[in-house]
């Protein structure tokens, strides 16, 4: 399965800055009924720990345009509490995905927009994003415009 362009467009426009890789994993499970093939412990450019989820041809972080660096076994000790916290969240999500989505307002909003927004509107938002990024316009402004 390839990365879903509609989902990427919504994540980068209307939901920019609101979603995490855990949210993307939950959305993929809910919308596409797919579980990740692999879990990757990573850090972002600021050194913040994040779990990334690998699927067939893409990672959850790609939906958010995040560049994550996998951490080594030795570095896992440094991030042990964050790893435990996020793995607990993963277990909660996997245990009852429907309930998790229902109790998370931004994910409910995302799914509603994903299902109800026309392909034309999403394509238009994606086009706005490309033009704005080419001109160096901030994501926050793009989010407000979409």
UniProtKB/Swiss-Prot annotation:
Localization, per the record, is:
Host membrane; Host cytoplasm
**Mutating residue 109 to E: effect?**
Loss of viral membrane assembly
Tell me the Pfam families matching this sequence.
Answer: Pox_H7
Q: Where are the transmembrane segments?
A: 10-32
Superkingdom, taxonomy of origin:
Viruses
Q: Which InterPro entries match?
A: Poxvirus_H7 (IPR006872)
Q: Which family does it belong to?
A: Belongs to the orthopoxvirus OPG112 family.
Entry function: Contributes to the formation of crescents and immature virions (IV). Interacts with phosphatidylinositol-3-phosphate (PI3P) and phosphatidylinositol-4-phosphate (PI4P) lipids in order to form virion membranes. Mechanistically, mediates proper formation of OPG125-hexamers, and hence the honey comb lattice and spherical immature virus.
Q: Any idea what this protein is called?
A: Late protein OPG112
